[in-house]
C-alpha cells in the first residue's frame, strides 16, 4: 500500500437497536455467594452470543436504576437465610429469568443504557456524555460563535446521542440546543461529501421542517444546533412531562397522557406527509419519524433531526420493521413510522409493538382505516401505502393547509449521487437482516411444528405400524397361506430380518425425537 493512501475504515459500528435476548442458564456457588450465568445473544444469529455472570446484588442495582420508569418489575425478593437451598436457588433463577424477559420485551427499557451495560459492559463502558463534550469543545475551537451552558443528560432515548444547551456569544440570553452523535452503522457517505451535505441543512426552508442554525461533522461524528424548545417535543406534550427529565421517567409509563383531537390529528398528519413528500422528491431520506422528533409551533408542526440518516443512525422503530421484508426502502420506513406516530397522537400512548390488530372500538372509521392500512399484520406483510396514497386518503385529502413560501432544498448532483449510493447500501443491509430474520422464523416454526403433540402422535402411530408391516412382508403373520412347513435355516433368516427391522426402527425413533 502506498504511504499516503487513505486507510479504509474496517471497524464495524455497533447497532444499538438490535435487541439483546438473555437466558439465566445456571447458578453456581462462589464461596459466600451465588453467581448466575446469563447467556446473551445479540439479534437473531446464535453465533453472536456470550455469557456474563451476575450476583443477585447486581440485579438489585439494575432494578434500582429502572425504577424511574414507573414500571412495576417483579424482581425476586431478597432472602437472608437459606440462600444456598437448592429449591430456593431454582426458584430465584426462574424469577430472575422472568425479570430480565420483562425488561427485554419493553421497547424503551431494553434500549436503555442500564440494560445494555448490564448485559454487555464491554461495548457500553465509555462515558458517552463526557466524550461528547470533548468533541464539541474541539469544534468550538474553530467555530467560536457559541458557549456551552450545560449538558442535558438522558433527555432522549438514543444511547450515543448527547444534548447540550448552548448560547450564541453575541446573544447570551438566547438558548439553543446542540445535539452530538457519533457515526452509526449505516454511515455510507464519504466524509468529504457528508460534511458538504451537513453544511446544506441550514439552507433548507420548509414550513414543516425545523430550521438548523449550524451543522457540521468531524472524523468521529456530527452535530447540529437548533433553537431550544421550552415546551419540548410532541411526545412531551402527549405525555404531559418536562422536556429536561430522563426519557424513561417521561415516556416509559407516563402517569397521565393526552390525545390530540381528531381535527388536530388530521392537520398534523397532513403537514408531516407533505414534509415527507418534499424530502422524498428531493432524494433525501428521513427514516427517523416519531413523536420525539416532532415539535409543535402553534398550530404548525416541524420535523427534527434530518441529520440522523446522514450520520448513519438506526431508526427508533428498526427492531419492529426489520420483521417485515416488505418494509425494505427508506420511503416505506417513513410510512411505517408515520403509522406509529398517528397511533400515538390518536390514542395518547405509544403502541410499543410492531403491529396492531385491535383498535379501540370507539375509533373514528376514517383514522382506523389509515391505521389498519399501515399497522395491521396484513398490511405489514402484504405491503404499505405510499405517502401519495396517504395524502389522497379521505382522512387527509380534505385538509387545507395555509399558504406558505415555496420550500427550498438545493442539492448538487455530485452530493445527490453520494446520497443515492448510501441509500442503496442502507437498504441492502436492511434486506440482508430481514432475510436472516425470516429464515430463522421459518426454521423456528418448522421445529415447533415437528415438536407439536399432533406430530408426535403421528410418529408414535407410525412406529407401531412399522413392525407389523415388516412381519407381513416376511410372511410371519398367522393366517398367511403356506403349503409346507418352513425349514430350519429359513426360520433363522426370518428371525434375523425381524431383529434388523426393529433395530432400524429404533434408530429412526431416536433420530425423530432428536
Model feature map: region roles:
Residues 268-269:
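Activation segment signature within eukaryotic-like protein kinase domains
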Residues 302, 308-369:
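C-lobe/activation-segment region of protein kinase-like
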Residues 220-233, 237:
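Conserved short submotifs of the Hanks-type protein kinase catalytic core
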Residues 276-297, 303:
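Catalytic-loop of the protein kinase fold
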Residues 211-222:
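Short beta-strand micro-motifs within the conserved protein kinase catalytic domain, predominantly
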Residues 402-514:
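Regulatory extensions appended to serine/threonine kinase catalytic cores
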Residues 1-187, 488, 500-502, 506-514:
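Phox homology (PX) phosphoinositide-binding domain
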Residues 377-404:
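Terminal C-lobe "cap" of eukaryotic-type protein kinase domains
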Amino acid at each position: 500500500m502506498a504511504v499516503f493512501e487513505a486507510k479504509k475504515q474496517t471497524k464495524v459500528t455497533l447497532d444499538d437497536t438490535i435487541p439483546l435476548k438473555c437466558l439465566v442458564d445456571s447458578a453456581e456457588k462462589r464461596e459466600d455467594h451465588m453467581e448466575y450465568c446469563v447467556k446473551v445473544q445479540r439479534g437473531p444469529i446464535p453465533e453472536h452470543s456470550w455469557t456474563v455472570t451476575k450476583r443477585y446484588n447486581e440485579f438489585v442495582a439494575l432494578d434500582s436504576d429502572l425504577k424511574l420508569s414507573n414500571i412495576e418489575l417483579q424482581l425476586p425478593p431478597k432472602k437472608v437465610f437459606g440462600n444456598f437451598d437448592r429449591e430456593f436457588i431454582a426458584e430465584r433463577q426462574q424469577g430472575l429469568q422472568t425479570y430480565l424477559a420483562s425488561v427485554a420485551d419493553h421497547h424503551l427499557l431494553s434500549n436503555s443504557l442500564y440494560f445494555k451495560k448490564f448485559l454487555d459492559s464491554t461495548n457500553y463502558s465509555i462515558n458517552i456524555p463526557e466524550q461528547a463534550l470533548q468533541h464539541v469543545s474541539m469544534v468550538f475551537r474553530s467555530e467560536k460563535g457559541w458557549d456551552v451552558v450545560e449538558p442535558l443528560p438522558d433527555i432522549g432515548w438514543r444511547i450515543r446521542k448527547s444534548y447540550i444547551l448552548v448560547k450564541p456569544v453575541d446573544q447570551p440570553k438566547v438558548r439553543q440546543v446542540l445535539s452530538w452523535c457519533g457515526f452509526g452503522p449505516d454511515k455510507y457517505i464519504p466524509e468529504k461529501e457528508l460534511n458538504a451535505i451537513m453544511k446544506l441543512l441550514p439552507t433548507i426552508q420548509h414550513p414543516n421542517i425545523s430550521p438548523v442554525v449550524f451543522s457540521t461533522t468531524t472524523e468521529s461524528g456530527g452535530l447540529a444546533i437548533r433553537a431550544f424548545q421550552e415546551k419540548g417535543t410532541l411526545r412531551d406534550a402527549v405525555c404531559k412531562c418536562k422536556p429536561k427529565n430522563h426519557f424513561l421517567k417521561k415516556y416509559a409509563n407516563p402517569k397521565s397522557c393526552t390525545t390530540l383531537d381528531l381535527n388536530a390529528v388530521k392537520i398534523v398528519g397532513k403537514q408531516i406527509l407533505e414534509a415527507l413528500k418534499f424530502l422524498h422528491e428531493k432524494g433525501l431520506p428521513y427514516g427517523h419519524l416519531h413523536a420525539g422528533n416532532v415539535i409543535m409551533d402553534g398550530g404548525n408542526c416541524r420535523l427534527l433531526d434530518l441529520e440522523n440518516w446522514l450520520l448513519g443512525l438506526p431508526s427508533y422503530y428498526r427492531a419492529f420493521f426489520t420483521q417485515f421484508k416488505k418494509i425494505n426502502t427508506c420511503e416505506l420506513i417513513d410510512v411505517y413510522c408515520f403509522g406509529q406516530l398517528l397511533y400515538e397522537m390518536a390514542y395518547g400512548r405509544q403502541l410499543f409493538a410492531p403491529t396492531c390488530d385491535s383498535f379501540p372500538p370507539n375509533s373514528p372509521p376514517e383514522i382506523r382505516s389509515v391505521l389498519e392500512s399501515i399497522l395491521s399484520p396484513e398490511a405489514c406483510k402484504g405491503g404499505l401505502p405510499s405517502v401519495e396514497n396517504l395524502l389522497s386518503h379521505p382522512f387527509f385529502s380534505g385538509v387545507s393547509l395555509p399558504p406558505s413560501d415555496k420550500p427550498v432544498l438545493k442539492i448538487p448532483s455530485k452530493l445527490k449521487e453520494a446520497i443515492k449510493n448510501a441509500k442503496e447500501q442502507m437498504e441492502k443491509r436492511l434486506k440482508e437482516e430481514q432475510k436472516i430474520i425470516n429464515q430463522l422464523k421459518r426454521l423456528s416454526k418448522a421445529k415447533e411444528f415437528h415438536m407439536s403433540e399432533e406430530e408426535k402422535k403421528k410418529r408414535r402411530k407410525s412406529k407401531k405400524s412399522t413392525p407389523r408391516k415388516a412381519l407381513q412382508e416376511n410372511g410371519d403373520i398367522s393366517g398367511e397361506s403356506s403349503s409346507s412347513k418352513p425349514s430350519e435355516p429359513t426360520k433363522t433368516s426370518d428371525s434375523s430380518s425381524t431383529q434388523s427391522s426393529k433395530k432400524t426402527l429404533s434408530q429412526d425413533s431416536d433420530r425423530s425425537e432428536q
